[in-house]
């Protein structure tokens, strides 16, 4: 059976949180354990440089790579089933990114909304947009097509990136002959989780995240401060359940559905205190996180396991990358010149 290749991953900007679990990790585990798919998970450290260029930020990337690795392995990403690789360790990505940049009209890139959103989140004004940030979607296309991925799991906010990738693949194949598959978008049921402050999706930069590695007391404290219904000033005031982060989290992480429905009824009637509902949520989230925390501590204590997992996956991706670039060189006609140069230098 020919497996469909899947490519997805994370920028190493720090530890992963419940938003990552809901938005991507659950889906990745399903794909990894499905025999129809061959999964490649990229730690996209080059992409981190598009918005984090200060020396102190760059110096943290190395430790963040191991944070992501430890989190991935602790939740069940298996290096025996999936290739986990480091983007910057694949030399071919730099060349393919350059070649694709020659084929991509600037207006196609500037029409992608996520570029300006990334700039806003990083407090970068439009006049200061770097070439690397503007070209971020082209580098992402190079990641996808270098791996010859058939499927790319993304949320709606990143669909335009995959559409650009399809356009680049079509353009290259039309001009130079067929090399690249045109990847399809693969969407999960949920793509984001509201932050604990009720303001937008959970993220490190917004300081509204519960991390997979947070200890029990930290989880309790974050949930104690969680945003609920601002109009509910007393426990006897009927509260709003819909859109309330407290109940969104209960629906996702409390497996006792009858209890959750009872909480909702009492909350709407003004017959229960926020503190009681929050305490139960903290209990359930801590029960949910306990296995991850235990496994993570084991991996952190044995960093060689993390290093071996990354090396194994990176070597697999290097092999794929070499094969892809050999096809690219052949179709472009560059390989003939390079071979003659190599032959004359011997």
From Swiss-Prot:
GO terms for biological process: tryptophanyl-tRNA aminoacylation. Coiled coil: none annotated. It is found in: Cytoplasm. ATP binds at residues 11-13, 19-20, 155-157, 193, 201-205. InterPro entries: aa-tRNA-synth_Ic, Rossmann-like_a/b/a_fold, Trp-tRNA-ligase, Trp-tRNA-ligase_bac-type, Trp-tRNA_synthetase. It holds the Pfam family tRNA-synt_1b. L-tryptophan binds at residue 143. GO terms for molecular function: ATP binding; tryptophan-tRNA ligase activity. It catalyses: tRNA(Trp) + L-tryptophan + ATP = L-tryptophyl-tRNA(Trp) + AMP + diphosphate + H(+). Its main location: cytoplasm. Transmembrane segments: none annotated. Keywords: Aminoacyl-tRNA synthetase, ATP-binding, Cytoplasm, Ligase, Nucleotide-binding, Protein biosynthesis. A motif ('HIGH' region) lies at residues 12-20. GO terms for cellular component: cytosol. PANTHER family: TRYPTOPHAN--TRNA LIGASE, MITOCHONDRIAL. Catalyzes the attachment of tryptophan to tRNA(Trp). Homodimer. Belongs to the class-I aminoacyl-tRNA synthetase family. This is Tryptophan--tRNA ligase. It comes from Chlamydia muridarum (strain MoPn / Nigg).
């Amino acid at each position: 059976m020919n497996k469909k290749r899947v490519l997805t991953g994370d920028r190493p900007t720090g530890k992963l949180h419940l938003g990552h679990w809901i938005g991507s990790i659950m889906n990745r585990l399903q794909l990894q354990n499905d025999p129809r798919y061959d999964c490649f998970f990229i730690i996209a450290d080059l992409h981190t440089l598009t918005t984090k260029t200060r020396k102190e930020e760059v110096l943290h990337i190395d430790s963040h790579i191991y944070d992501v690795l430890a989190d991935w392995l602790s939740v069940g990403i298996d290096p025996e089933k999936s290739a986990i690789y480091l983007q910057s360790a694949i030399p071919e990505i730099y060349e393919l990114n350059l070649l694709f940049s020659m084929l991509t009209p600037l207006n196609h890139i500037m029409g992608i909304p996520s570029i300006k959103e990334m700039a806003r989140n990083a407090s970068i004004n439009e006049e200061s947009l770097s070439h690397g940030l503007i070209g971020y979607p082209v580098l992402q296309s190079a990641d996808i097509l270098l791996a010859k991925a058939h499927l790319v799991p993304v949320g709606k906010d990143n669909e335009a990136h995959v559409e650009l990738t399809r356009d680049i693949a079509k353009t290259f194949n039309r001009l130079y002959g067929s090399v690249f598959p045109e990847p399809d978008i693969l969407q999960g049921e949920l793509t984001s989780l509201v932050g604990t402050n009720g303001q937008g999706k959970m993220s490190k930069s917004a300081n509204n995240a519960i991390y997979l590695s947070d200890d029990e007391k930290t989880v309790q404290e974050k949930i104690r401060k969680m945003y609920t219904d601002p109009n509910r000033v007393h426990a006897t005031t009927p509260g709003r359940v819909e859109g309330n982060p407290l109940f969104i989290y209960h629906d996702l992480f409390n497996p006792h559905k009858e209890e959750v429905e009872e909480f909702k009824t009492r909350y709407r009637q003004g017959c229960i205190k926020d503190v009681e509902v929050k305490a139960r949520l903290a209990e359930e989230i801590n029960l949910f996180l306990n296995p991850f925390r235990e496994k993570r501590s084991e991996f952190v204590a044995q960093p060689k396991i993390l290093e071996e997992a990354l090396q194994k996956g990176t070597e697999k991706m290097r092999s794929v990358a070499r094969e892809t670039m050999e096809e690219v060189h052949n179709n472009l006609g560059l390989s003939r010149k390079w071979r003659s140069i190599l032959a004359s230098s011997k």
